[in-house]
């Protein structure tokens, strides 16, 4: 293939476009709601949008630091040239904390074992003590908190760690009226008092992620850890954020079929009337949930049309309807599977709803390994393949 032909292929295939200006706008919108700092949580490849692209766009919107759930992600930020503070939580106790500290990465400490490991491997490391504020997931159980704070203070006096933060996390922030939120807030306030009482002076006190930041100022403290909100997901439904993703693909073929034509694996759908079927070269290997057939809609030739039959590994069938005057779609036309919703196209929230999942799950599953990824905004357009963090042009 000539370079021109390659380029042609590249511009007409399935394409996931990431508009990083949405990320910047979202951070700005969130910053207007809180006096605290914004930590951009760019775990899971920036919620499937691209770690470095989301990180850069978040800084442009006023985020001042990063949060990740593995040291690998922290190093990826450093390798990409980001010098801001990075906090990593969820690290196994035998992680390379020495390497983390040398890279200037702050470490969450959910208990004595982590504290000992950090003190041994990375004397002087900056740590955030992590309190379980009601999830029974990550963080020290409240009954171990006092002891953890005192042990940490002793380690700090001996020069083994510096406790720069205290963190908690709310289980039910997406439901602002849920009683667990009040309990979580009180537990966190207690946790901070205990830390201060033990002689610790944590400058960073953080409880809120996106939903709590948007819906409850009492959770704000000195900083918010924002992940979903970066990419336009607001579970609390209280603020209008902007989605950054658009997935498009060409119609490979359009065919006319008679009434009674079964479609796809398992023949789960049969055409009730003569109709036209369009074939879209995107499927569950690209992150579309297989079960979304017959509930999902896509936009083609300006109208919403239903997905029919089961979604296959790399293709999806759309019922274009019998009437070309209503949906004048032809082979080669671009189908929008989702976008920010500006022109009536579905959004990733619609897709998540159609399969009964969270938008977070839907967006983090997208993209590997076939979708071409294009980043737009901030005066750059770059191309690459998702899942590889690659960008061919910059
Ligand atoms: C993922 C995560 C966040 C970010 O949460 P969002 O709701 O996506 O903003 C914050 N804190 C912790 C501990 C997390 O694991």
Question: What is the meaning of each model-derived region?
Answer:
Residues 256-394:
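C-terminal accessory subdomain/extension
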Residues 42-44, 70-71, 110-112, 131-133, ...:
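Fold-independent oxyanion-binding glycine-rich loops
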Residues 23, 77, 209, 251, ...:
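Divalent metal-coordination and catalytic microenvironments
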Residues 177-274:
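Anionic-ligand-binding alpha/beta catalytic cores of soluble enzymes and soluble regulatory domains
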Residues 32-34, 100, 121-122, 128, ...:
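Solvent-exposed alpha-helices and their adjacent loops that cap or buttress functional pockets
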Residues 105, 203, 222, 226, ...:
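Structural beta-strand/beta-sheet cores of well-ordered domains, especially the beta-sheet scaffolds
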Residues 140-141, 215-216, 254, 318-320:
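Short beta-strand-to-turn element immediately C-terminal to the catalytic PLP-Schiff-base lysine
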Residues 5-10, 14-25, 36-206, 220:
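Active-site-proximal beta-alpha core segment in soluble small-molecule metabolic enzymes
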């Amino acid at each position: 293939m000539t370079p021109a032909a390659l380029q042609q292929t590249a511009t007409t295939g399935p394409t996931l476009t990431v508009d990083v200006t949405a990320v910047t706008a979202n951070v700005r919108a969130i910053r207007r709601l809180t006096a605290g700092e914004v930590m951009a949580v760019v775990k899971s490849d920036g919620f499937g949008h691209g770690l470095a692209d989301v990180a850069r766009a978040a800084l442009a919107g006023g985020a001042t630091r990063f949060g990740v759930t593995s040291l690998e992600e922290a190093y990826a930020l450093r390798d990409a040239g980001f010098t801001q503070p990075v906090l990593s939580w969820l690290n196994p106790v035998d992680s390379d904390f020495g390497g983390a500290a040398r890279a200037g990465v702050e470490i969450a400490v959910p208990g004595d074992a982590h504290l000992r490991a950090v003190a041994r491997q990375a004397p002087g490391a900056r740590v955030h003590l992590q309190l379980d504020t009601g999830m029974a997931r990550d963080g020290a159980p409240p009954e171990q908190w006092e002891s953890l704070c005192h042990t940490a203070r002793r380690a700090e006096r001996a020069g083994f760690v510096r406790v720069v933060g205290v963190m908690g996390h709310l289980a039910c922030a997406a439901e602002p009226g849920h009683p667990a939120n009040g309990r979580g807030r009180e537990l966190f306030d207690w946790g901070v008092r205990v830390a201060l009482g033990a002689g610790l002076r944590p400058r960073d006190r953080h409880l809120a992620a996106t939903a709590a930041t948007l819906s409850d100022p009492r959770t704000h403290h000195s900083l918010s850890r924002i992940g979903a909100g970066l990419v336009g997901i607001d579970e609390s439904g209280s603020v209008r954020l902007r989605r950054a993703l658009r997935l498009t693909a060409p119609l490979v073929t359009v065919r006319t079929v008679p009434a009674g034509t079964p479609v796809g694996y398992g023949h789960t759908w049969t055409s009730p009337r003569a109709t036209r079927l369009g074939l879209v070269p995107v499927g569950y290997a690209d992150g579309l949930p297989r079960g979304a057939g017959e509930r999902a809609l896509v936009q083609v030739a300006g109208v919403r049309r239903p997905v029919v039959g089961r979604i296959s590994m790399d293709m999806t069938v759309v019922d274009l309807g019998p009437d070309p005057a209503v949906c004048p779609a032809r082979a080669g036309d671009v189908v929008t599977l989702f976008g920010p919703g500006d022109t009536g196209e579905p959004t990733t929230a619609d897709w998540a709803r159609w399969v009964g999942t969270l938008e977070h799950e839907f967006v983090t599953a997208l993209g590997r390994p076939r979708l071409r990824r294009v980043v737009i905004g901030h005066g750059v357009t770059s191309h690459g393949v998702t899942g590889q963090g690659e960008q061919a042009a910059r």
